[in-house]
């Protein structure tokens, strides 16, 4: 009887650890309520368009839709989350400005990305010619994606 209880407890613990993340607030997920995060991340998107135009962004993952955001020049939008146990967490954003748009991944499981983000904080900046990622390893913004023409 003791082994059955231990087995059921082990199964329950496994299910809790592998449950999908759902963003409840800026820095809380459903898994955080039961189990601490293994790795916590923050993604930031900033409007660095020197033309003064508004940057429209719509970011989401498989489980979380962060909604439509309009960023004025120098405004930022950030969110926090814990990477899931399967290391399959993926966030992407649609972004547009007056004369361009793009669909771009802003977080995925990749050691090179993690190194550039200093293993905790990915900062993306929309500039006139495209989207840049702050590379903390070299201390500068690096062009990641160019704008596509049109809306």
From Swiss-Prot:
It holds the Pfam family Self-incomp_S1. Disulfide bonds: none annotated. Belongs to the plant self-incompatibility (S1) protein family. The keyword Secreted applies. One of its GO terms (cellular component) is extracellular region. Residues 1-25 form the signal peptide. GO terms for biological process: rejection of self pollen. This is S-protein homolog 74. InterPro entries: Self-incomp_S1. It is found in: Secreted. The gene is SPH74. Keywords: Secreted, Self-incompatibility, Signal.
């Amino acid at each position: 009887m003791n082994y059955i209880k231990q087995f059921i407890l082990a199964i329950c613990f496994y299910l809790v650890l592998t449950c999908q993340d759902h963003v409840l607030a800026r820095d809380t997920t459903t898994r955080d309520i039961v189990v601490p995060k293994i790795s916590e991340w923050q993604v930031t998107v900033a409007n660095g368009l020197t033309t003064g135009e508004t940057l429209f962004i719509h970011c989401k993952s498989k489980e979380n839709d962060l909604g439509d955001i309009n960023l004025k020049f120098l405004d930022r939008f950030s969110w926090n989350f814990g990477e899931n146990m399967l290391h399959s967490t993926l966030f992407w954003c649609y972004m547009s400005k007056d004369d361009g748009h793009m669909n771009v991944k802003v977080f995925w499981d990749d050691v090179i990305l993690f190194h550039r983000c200093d293993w905790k904080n990915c900062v993306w900046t929309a500039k006139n010619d495209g989207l840049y990622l702050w590379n903390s390893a070299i201390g500068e913004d690096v062009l990641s994606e160019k704008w596509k023409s049109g809306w």
